[in-house]
Amino acid sequence: MKKISFFLLFTQIFIFFLTSMLLACIKPKWISSFDVVKIIRTHFQEKVWHSGTLDPMASGLMILGVGKGTKELTSLIGLDKSYETTIDFSLLTDTRDASFREKEERFEVVESKEAWVACFLKKEGNLIPAPSLDQISQLLDSILFKEEKQVLLPLPTFSAKKQNGKRLYKDARKGKAEIQEKPMKIYAYEILDYHFPLLKLRLEVGSGTYIRSIGYWLGQQLGLGGALIQLERISTGKFQLSDIWMQTYAKGNIKGQERTIYFKELSQ
């Protein structure tokens, strides 16, 4: 009896340990954040929730709470984040990224015979010169967060942001959405690569900042398109995507395809 009681006590402690944790997960592209939650929930057979979503097109770091660990997620709300993204200035979509729903415009890139510019973008019959790195840097400098001053940038109409108690994407699906602006914080940027029409950036931003908004705004300022074709979250607060080892994982079936979610338990 004593051995059985000890075994039951040990089992209860072990189960409590397993079902009270935070996980850092790698979300793959082209599945939803809720698909990630579903796979992890099935793996642990416990309630699971997240500290913030990623767009279906995006990949990278997601923080999940498992079991009693869901109560710890409130401490992660509002943390700064960093991303790597690629903006395509020859593309314009209704979602501001490659996961367009109904509207997609692609503009032709034309090689230049002029010495002062490498190429042009052909848009609505006009030839728009490819912007220089200096032009792009000046624009990004102008929206950096300074002296507690946030900048107003256009919200993507296809977003989960609520307006008048309703998600914006619901009106967007009906063609009724209006472009709204929202205060956003951009702390720092680094230009990783630029070969027109593609611009690759690393961005450090405040919570609630839409990277799609930055890409679209840049394109509008330059008279070009501006849609994300790649987006990866690389950090949330002190948690880094690079800290996740590709060893511990959960598998699940999403729309007939097996997907793998790699994760690491975080110390609370």
Segments predicted by a language model, with ranges:
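Short, intrinsically disordered low-complexity segments
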Residues: 1-2, 258
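Polybasic, lysine-rich low-complexity intrinsically disordered segments
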Residues: 3-4, 13
